[in-house]
Amino acid sequence: MANIIEGKLNAEGFKFGIIVSRFNSFICDRLVEGALDTLVRHGAADGDIDILRVPGAFEIPVAAQKAAASKRYDALICLGAVIRGSTPHFDYVCAEVSKGVASVSLDSGMPVSFGVITTDSIEQAIERAGTKAGNKGTDAAITAIEMVNLFKVI
């Protein structure tokens, strides 16, 4: 039988950086609340969590890159909300943010979870920030916890 290796959901002793956009703060603040609650419930100490605020979602990857290079963190959690408007700007921002965050993770070898919600409406964003569709900040924090534990054993 094959060995199954997976990360545990224990945040104790790890340092986390949460990188969050200020734009659409009424949504992003809920994502941060979900991430913080999840990290603490899984054993992270308040002093082991930093929140790095950036102006918008487009700035998340470069802040994540700098945070990863600092070696201060065991994992990063990227949070933001991009809501479709009437121009193609949405498509460009979404594509670059997702590619940028993935690139930081691959280049640094550090777990970098993606909790940037991309929606067609404010209603959809609200649903994904703690109402009907759960909280994507919570999901991103769980991913970071699991991955940092997996990286510890592989």
Swiss-Prot record:
The gene is ribH. This is 6,7-dimethyl-8-ribityllumazine synthase. NCBIfam families: lumazine-synth, PRK00061.1-4. Catalyzes the formation of 6,7-dimethyl-8-ribityllumazine by condensation of 5-amino-6-(D-ribitylamino)uracil with 3,4-dihydroxy-2-butanone 4-phosphate. This is the penultimate step in the biosynthesis of riboflavin. It catalyses: (2S)-2-hydroxy-3-oxobutyl phosphate + 5-amino-6-(D-ribitylamino)uracil = 6,7-dimethyl-8-(1-D-ribityl)lumazine + phosphate + 2 H2O + H(+). (2S)-2-hydroxy-3-oxobutyl phosphate binds at residues 86-87, 128. It is an enzyme of class 2 (transferase). GO terms for cellular component: cytosol; riboflavin synthase complex. The keyword Transferase applies. Pathway: Cofactor biosynthesis; riboflavin biosynthesis; riboflavin from 2-hydroxy-3-oxobutyl phosphate and 5-amino-6-(D-ribitylamino)uracil: step 1/2. Coiled coil: none annotated. Keywords: Riboflavin biosynthesis, Transferase. It comes from Syntrophotalea carbinolica (strain DSM 2380 / NBRC 103641 / GraBd1). PANTHER family: 6,7-DIMETHYL-8-RIBITYLLUMAZINE SYNTHASE, 6,7-DIMETHYL-8-RIBITYLLUMAZINE SYNTHASE DMRL SYNTHASE LUMAZINE SYNTHASE. The active site is at residue 89. GO terms for molecular function: 6,7-dimethyl-8-ribityllumazine synthase activity. Its EC number is 2.5.1.78. InterPro entries: LS, LS/RS, LS/RS_sf. Gene3D superfamilies: Lumazine/riboflavin synthase (3.40.50.960). Belongs to the DMRL synthase family. GO terms for biological process: riboflavin biosynthetic process. SUPFAM superfamilies: Lumazine synthase (SSF52121). 5-amino-6-(D-ribitylamino)uracil binds at residues 23, 57-59, 81-83, 114.
